[in-house]
A protein has these predicted regions:
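Catalytic core of pol beta-like nucleotidyltransferases
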Residues: 1-44, 55-61, 71-115
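Glycine-rich beta-strand-to-loop/alpha-helix junction loops that act as flexible
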Residues: 50-53
Length: 115
């Protein structure tokens, strides 16, 4: 590979990493915005947690935003997903804490960030 090709690929990979980090940061902002909007709409929400690949090096361009919500009414699930997806560019995987086993909740909370 020529020196020009090496430099091209070095720059390309750096730009890709920069773009991915920008998208990850947008995910953080989306999570915070979604948490605030959900709390405003459903006052019974006790906690919103961000978990999954957005918090570590597994985040990729196709990654989604993983949210765990405690206290969201069951009938509000689809509205909450729509609200969270409207808060930013990432698709959202939203889980009601009450729908999960205690073991799974504890595993998710160990590697989560409260919003």
């Amino acid at each position: 590979m020529t020196i020009h090709a090496q430099e091209y690929w070095r720059q390309r990979f750096a730009a890709d990493r920069e773009q991915l980090e920008k998208r990850r940061q947008e995910g953080f902002a989306q999570g915070a915005k979604a948490a605030a909007a959900m709390r405003k709409r459903w006052s019974q929400i006790r906690a919103v947690h961000l978990f999954g690949s957005v918090l570590d090096d597994r985040f990729r361009s196709h990654s989604d935003l993983d949210l765990l919500v405690e206290g969201l009414p069951p009938a509000a699930l689809l509205d909450a997903i729509a609200l969270a997806e409207g808060a930013g560019p990432l698709p959202v995987d939203l889980k009601r804490q009450e729908d999960l086993s205690e073991d799974l909740v504890q595993r998710l909370l160990r590697k989560s960030q409260t919003l």
